[in-house]
């Protein structure tokens, strides 16, 4: 049987963009009778060795290691994901693994933007060595591919396969009703830059709801302190982690989904909102977001609080919301994970 190892420092129940990507890709491959093992750590964002060593999740074998993975069993392909979460024993072993003279299995890597982020001279050098050693690199956007090529990675090795969107985003019944709030979905961490939205809300007649796991407790404390300093307790709510059903219901009823991250590989929550026909507002710092969202067409791209105020005022017009929502549904029809997984499997088999 064709066997794929997915290697990722963190995995579900940790829910970030990379973790959700690996789960959905693995689940679809299992449906195609591919034997998939996810190798990961037992860590969460905030606790070490918290999770059980082994489980089967939707047909996916999940093997959680105490410190790092060990190469064995000669899988058909090794697919690496996102070494950028933290420089750990896991990452060190992976870097050393790539220095081995020969490995039977083809090596594929989806960097999830880490190859285009500056992590210091030593880490950048190690990443470039990985780029030379892998057989293929998967970029999730044309922007990421162009950035990698500009940094010296071999363009002939890079294939663009965008992130998919979970079938539930397409199929879950639409929640009726409308409430006047912006919804910010993302882990609580400085690079997600929720503080920008909070600073803007003080001068806007709209509420802000935040959902997502806490990766950085200090940043959550900073957020809540700033909310208190600005007297926004009635306008800003942090709901923590919610179910997928609750997430989509919150999306459907919102004025817009907002994301003002400093950096993103693609911004899967923005794509989920587009599938639901919900308007989106994105910051211009994470350049990839403006390749998905065209200002005034299927959402708004902002760089300041005034831009956000202007976007909110435009979205108060039901005709504008309806037109943007319809544009988003039209754009997003090809984003089902099965389509994405077929492209990835085709790539694997081209290396066999």
Swiss-Prot record:
GO terms for biological process: protein glycosylation; S-layer organization. Pfam families: Glyco_transf_4, Glycos_transf_1. Disruption phenotype: Reduced molecular weights of the S-layer glycoprotein and archaellins due to a change in the N-glycan composition. The tribranched hexasaccharide glycan of S-layer glycoprotein is a pentasaccharide that lacks a terminal hexose residue. It comes from the Archaea. One of its GO terms (molecular function) is glycosyltransferase activity. InterPro entries: AGL16-like (IPR053689), Glyco_trans_1 (IPR001296), Glyco_trans_4-like_N (IPR028098), Glycosyltransferase_grp1 (IPR050194). Pathway: Protein modification; protein glycosylation; Cell surface structure biogenesis; S-layer biogenesis. Its EC number is 2.4.1.-. Keywords: Glycosyltransferase, Transferase. SUPFAM superfamilies: UDP-Glycosyltransferase/glycogen phosphorylase (SSF53756). CDD domains: GT4_PimA-like (cd03801). PANTHER family: SULFOQUINOVOSYL TRANSFERASE SQD2. Belongs to the glycosyltransferase group 1 family. Glycosyltransferase 4 subfamily. Glycosyltransferase catalyzing the last biosynthesis step of the N-glycan biosynthesis. This is Archaeal glycosylation protein 16. It comes from Sulfolobus acidocaldarius (strain ATCC 33909 / DSM 639 / JCM 8929 / NBRC 15157 / NCIMB 11770). The gene is agl16.
């Amino acid at each position: 049987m064709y066997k794929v190892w997915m290697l990722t420092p963190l995995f579900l129940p940790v829910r970030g963009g990379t973790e959700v990507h690996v789960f959905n890709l693995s689940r679809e491959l299992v449906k195609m009778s591919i034997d998939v093992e996810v190798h990961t750590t037992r860590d969460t964002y905030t606790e070490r060795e918290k999770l059980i060593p082994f489980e089967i999740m939707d047909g996916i074998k999940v093997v959680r290691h105490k410190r790092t993975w060990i190469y064995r069993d000669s899988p058909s392909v090794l697919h690496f994901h996102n070494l950028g979460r933290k420089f750990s024993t896991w990452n060190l072993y992976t870097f050393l693994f790539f220095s081995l003279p020969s490995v039977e299995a083809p090596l594929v890597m989806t960097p999830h933007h880490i190859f285009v982020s500056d992590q210091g001279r030593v880490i950048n050098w190690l990443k470039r060595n990985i780029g030379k050693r892998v057989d293929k690199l998967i970029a999730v956007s044309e922007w990421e591919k162009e950035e990698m090529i500009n940094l010296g990675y071999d363009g002939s090795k890079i294939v663009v396969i965008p992130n998919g969107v979970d079938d539930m985003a397409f199929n879950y019944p639409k929640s009726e009703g409308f409430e006047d709030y912006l919804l910010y979905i993302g882990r609580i961490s400085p690079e997600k830059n929720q503080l920008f939205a909070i600073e803007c809300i003080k001068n806007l007649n709209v509420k802000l709801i935040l959902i997502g796991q806490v990766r950085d407790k200090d940043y959550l404390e900073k957020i809540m302190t700033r909310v208190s300093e600005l007297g926004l307790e009635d306008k800003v709510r942090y709901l923590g982690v919610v179910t997928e059903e609750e997430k989509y219901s919150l999306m459907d009823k919102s004025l817009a989904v907002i994301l003002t991250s400093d950096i993103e590989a693609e911004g899967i929550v923005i794509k989920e909102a587009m599938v639901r026909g919900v308007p989106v507002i994105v910051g211009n710092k994470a350049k990839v977001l403006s390749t998905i969202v065209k200002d005034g067409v299927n959402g708004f791209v902002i760089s300041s609080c005034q831009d956000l105020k202007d976007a909110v005022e435009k979205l108060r017009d039901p005709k504008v919301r309806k037109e943007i929502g319809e544009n988003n549904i039209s754009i997003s029809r090809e984003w089902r994970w099965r389509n994405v997984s077929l492209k990835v499997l085709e790539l694997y088999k081209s290396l066999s």
